[in-house]
């Protein structure tokens, strides 16, 4: 079976390697500065951790695009270290929380605003944690109420409630799913959000439902449709250069879940790192 298409621009291998090396060097020099006791960049970690987690994820996106998978486990490990802290602090508002960043240890009062990302970012973070099999982080992200996420419209609310319902074993999943589908109607969305929702989120939901139902035929069809929708969306010039398009974190997390639960495999595609889906992080980093 031929690999599925991707939207990546053709770049000479030499240039790919140069770009990756620059990104990799930036990642390590950034964290060397951040964790240097003398420079004390991390005097106020609550203000930095969420954005610094995404700094690490951008390095992962670049490495994935250029096939440098051996570097990615370090990027993901740092991102999840920070995200665990972010959601631990957000879920323990007004309580003193002990946590670490690298070799440095902190004691801070929890604050709900430490999270405060968009629904899209929250979903990507959950799926990254799923792919890395960090179930503690998934739990921290899904026990919170939706007020910790910046919600733009009724669809955002419905999708957050559905995802939390899945991980909370809610008996109301059919009703929550129906609400997601209803709120995805253009009448509930800003016009600019319609293609975004229907290219990235509804395909994600369809794949998730197939996993919940244990239906492999539906899963394989929904996954291919979702990958094609991802490809078509990121072919748009407005988003073609977005690092987030290099890997579908949402689908990677679901594919890892399906593999662990049922042993279901994935098609050949740059958007789903096989080593991450199949839990080969240790082998990849050697």
Language-model features: locations:
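Intrinsically disordered, low-structural-confidence terminal and linker regions
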Residues: 1-10
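Eukaryote-skewed repeat-based solenoidal scaffolds used as protein-protein interaction platforms
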Residues: 12-227
